[in-house]
């Protein structure tokens, strides 16, 4: 188990001439933040291995998951437009600790089919 975020590497699940699919660990920014202490991020790490890699979307710092990066400006535009047009299906899963409520049929868990926040 990593002892510090600097020990957490991006895992590349797919790379070709058009795009990268990276597994971003929780605790790592997708893009640089404000301040010198917030420059370590997935996009900077990806650019070290794949110069010119371009951000398509972001994941919250506390979220681990798949991050798409484009290898060309044309691919970045196309993928960004697909996200904007909601053509990309996203799924989120949570790992919880403690007791989970009964199934939806019994008044417990189910699917949420709403945006996380208003656009």
Show the residue positions of the predicted features.
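RNA pseudouridine synthases
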Residues: 1-119
